[in-house]
C-alpha cells in the first residue's frame, strides 16, 4: 500500500514518534511524505520515504495529485488546528480529494493508530480493488 505521511511544524515530533513506533508495520509499505517530514522520518527510522516538496511549496498538491490518480491508499496528516497555515486551501483540497476517492485519512494520532492497526490486520485490502487490481497486483481488465 502507498501511505502519505504529512505533519505541520508543531506536529512533526509527534509524527516521528508515530512512525518510529509503527516502523515494523510501515516497513511493509511504500511511504510518501512532504519534504521535512519525510526527511525526519527517514533519519529516525531508516525507512525509505519518497519525498515531495514541503507543504507550502506544493507538497500537499503533489500528494493530492496521487490521490486524484487513485495512486494513494492511506493518508496520515497530523494537522495543527491551532495555527493558521498559509497554504490552507491546499490542505482543504487534499482532504476533499480523500473524500472524493475514498482514501482513508487520519488527521490526529488517535485516528492514525486505528488506521495503522487496521492496515496491520489487512482491513484496508479493499483499496487494491478500488485501484482496479487483483490480489496478485496486476491490473484488472476492467480498469479504465
From Swiss-Prot:
InterPro entries the record matches: Methylgl_synth, Methylglyoxal_synth_AS, MGS-like_dom, MGS-like_dom_sf
Residues annotated as catalytic: 60 (proton donor/acceptor)
Catalytic activity: dihydroxyacetone phosphate = methylglyoxal + phosphate
Domain MGS-like positions: 1-144
Recorded superkingdom: Bacteria
Entry GO MF terms: methylglyoxal synthase activity
GO cellular component terms given for this protein: cytosol
Listed SUPFAM superfamilies: Methylglyoxal synthase-like
Coiled-coil zones: none
GO biological process, one term: methylglyoxal biosynthetic process
EC code(s) of this entry: 4.2.3.3
Residues annotated for substrate binding in this entry: 8, 12, 34-37, 54-55, 87
Entry keyword set: Lyase
UniProt xrefs under NCBIfam families: MGSA, PRK05234.1
Family: Belongs to the methylglyoxal synthase family.
The protein's role, per its UniProt record: Catalyzes the formation of methylglyoxal from dihydroxyacetone phosphate.
Protein name according to UniProt: Methylglyoxal synthase
